[in-house]
Structure formats: structure tokens, C-alpha cells
Amino acid sequence: MVLGCSVIIHHEFFGEIERDFSTSIMTNTTRQFDTYVSRGVMLNNYANIFGLIMQMRQVANHPDLILKKHSEGGQNVLVCSICDEPAEGPIRSRCHHEFCRQCARDYMRSFESGSIVDCPRCHIPLAIDFEQPDIEQDEEVVKKNSIINRIRMEDWTSSTKIEMLVYDLYKLRSKKQTHKSIVFSQFTSMLQLVEWRLRRAGFNTVMLDGSMTPAQRQNSIHHFMNNVNVEVFLVSLKAGGVALNLTEASRVFIVDP
């Protein structure tokens, strides 16, 4: 039996601060892209263009995904050379740069078959062994470098997209029956901000991201599936695409553009 589903796309306007910041990012991106085109070097700067597109996706979620990338407290953790987020399922190239496993796959697949792919950091031909195990990271260091620990959260301002999510989840909660929801994002930092906001709005949440061990991931899934009080499961797109059968959830939210 095939059950019907509904896809709803919300369109909302930024507040003034978000709009000004996103406009500046878009203007800078357009200027750089036009420069590459006018000089005839667009294909030689594919990695830079990939990064510019990534920035535009991040600013649509929350300005802090860009503003707080390199703030104090963000050291000693592996950072992806493509998305500039803490690396999920971290792997290392032959030129000794770190990547999220999924980011590296997507990046290399974006090139035509047989073409030479340059490293986005050092611009030499990129070679990665995708069979290598994840680079081990200290769990406490990863937690310490969370974006939540790099922001004065008492002064923090939410974003239009996060507030839309909170509003939609509140509407589900107002019904008599319990609804479980999954929130997907490519950016771990976005999920951390969403988690912080939802918990302060009274929602019980659980998270699954690429920094977790297989046992930790399974425990998170079990907790979401079997605890009636947990309403929201925050899942990284880079970590949650394998062997997930979350039939308990009746709503899915994708927050990335």
C-alpha cells in the first residue's frame, strides 16, 4: 500500500538584518563570479565557485553559520575544506586536507567523468581514498567546538527560518495526538542552533550527526523511536542517509535551500 504525502514549501521574507547581510553575500558572490567569467578562468576556479554557492546556502539558514566560522573556540577540530563546517565522517586527501566524506563525494561527482578535479584548498589534483576509515576525533573537543560554545547565546538572535520551524512544530503540538518530526540539514552548526532554540521552546530533541560512533547513532535512533516525549529528531544529511527507517515520524522538515 502506498500512502499519500504532501510537500509544502514555505516562502518567508528575511528581517532587515538578515536581508542586508544576505544581500552583501549575494553581491560579493556575483562580483567574484563575474570576474572569473570576464577573465575566462571560470573553470579554473570551480572550487571557489562551489564555496561561494555553499555560503549562499548557509546565509539562508542563519548568518552565524558564516559569521562564527572562525570565531574563538573553533580550533583543534577537523574542518571540511568544502563546507567549512566541522568535518562529518572526516577523511583526508593525499595533499593532507580534511573533508566531510559526503562533501568530498558530492564535490568530485560534480565534475565530468574523466576530468581533473582540483583540491579546493591547494588546487593540485585531488586524490582521496574513500575506503579509508573516519579520522578519529576527541569527542570532548568536538563538543567544545560546537557553534553554541562559540557564541554568547544570551545575546543570540534567531533567524527567520528557525522561527518558521518553531512555529510549524508548535502547530503540530497543538493537536491532541503526538506527532514526531525529523529535521534535516547539511550543516551541523545549523542543527546545533535549531536544537538550542527548540529546547528553549520546550521541545525534547535528539540529534544524529557524522561525529557520532555507530553505537551512538543507533542509540539516538532508538531513543527517538521509543520515547514518546521526544518530538524532534535532528539529522545531518551527511550522516543520516544510511539504514534509517524512521517510520515513527509523520513530518519531515528540510531547512537547507
Mark where each language-model region is.
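ASCE P-loop NTPase motor core, strongest for the SF2 helicase catalytic module
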Residues: 1-6, 15-19, 23-257
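Interdomain hinge/linker elements that couple catalytic modules in large macromolecular machines
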Residues: 11-12
